[in-house]
């Protein structure tokens, strides 16, 4: 699963996920893409699960690019622990997603196959997504 190899600080504040994506909004590597049209968080497990669904569907046909990376640690206190005594330990990693961000890209397959692969991947994600193609020019 994806996670940073090193970080300056182990824990991060919660923050707020606002605004629209300004970078990574166009299909730039492949011919087809899966774009988020809602905001939210994707865990490393969800990103990997969607990738596996796509890979299984296209078999050895094309190439897949993951355009997002889970770089935010989410901490959690253990079960049945009283409040206080500091922040919990980092439990998992998430990628904060803004509307307009391209999540995955695909190349080397026809549009019908790409559409179906992205449909299977989108079912694994907690965000609303849309199929996009590369704009020439």
Curated annotation (Swiss-Prot):
Swiss-Prot/TrEMBL keywords: Ribonucleoprotein, Ribosomal protein, RNA-binding, rRNA-binding, tRNA-binding
Entry-linked Pfam families: Ribosomal_L16
Positions with biased composition (Basic residues): 1-13
Keyword Ribonucleoprotein: yes
Biological processes, Gene Ontology terms: translation
GO cellular component: cytosolic large ribosomal subunit
GO terms of molecular function: rRNA binding; structural constituent of ribosome; tRNA binding
Record region (Disordered): 1-22
Family according to the record: Belongs to the universal ribosomal protein uL16 family.
Role according to the record: Binds 23S rRNA and is also seen to make contacts with the A and possibly P site tRNAs.
HAMAP family per UniProt: Ribosomal_uL16
Subunit structure, as described in the record: Part of the 50S ribosomal subunit.
Protein name: Large ribosomal subunit protein uL16
């Amino acid at each position: 699963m994806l996670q940073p190899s090193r970080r300056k600080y182990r824990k991060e504040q919660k923050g707020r996920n606002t605004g629209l994506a300004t970078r990574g909004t166009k299909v730039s590597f492949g011919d087809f893409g899966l774009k988020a049209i809602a905001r939210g968080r994707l865990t490393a497990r969800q990103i990997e699960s969607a990738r596996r669904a796509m890979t299984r569907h296209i078999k050895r046909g094309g190439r897949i690019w993951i355009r997002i990376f889970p770089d935010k640690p989410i901490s959690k206190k253990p079960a049945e622990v009283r409040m206080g005594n500091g922040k919990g330990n980092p439990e998992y990693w998430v990628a904060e997603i803004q509307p307009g961000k391209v999540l995955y890209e695909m190349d080397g397959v026809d549009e019908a196959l790409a559409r179906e692969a992205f449909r299977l991947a989108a079912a694994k994600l907690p965000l609303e997504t849309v199929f996009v193609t590369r704009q020439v020019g």
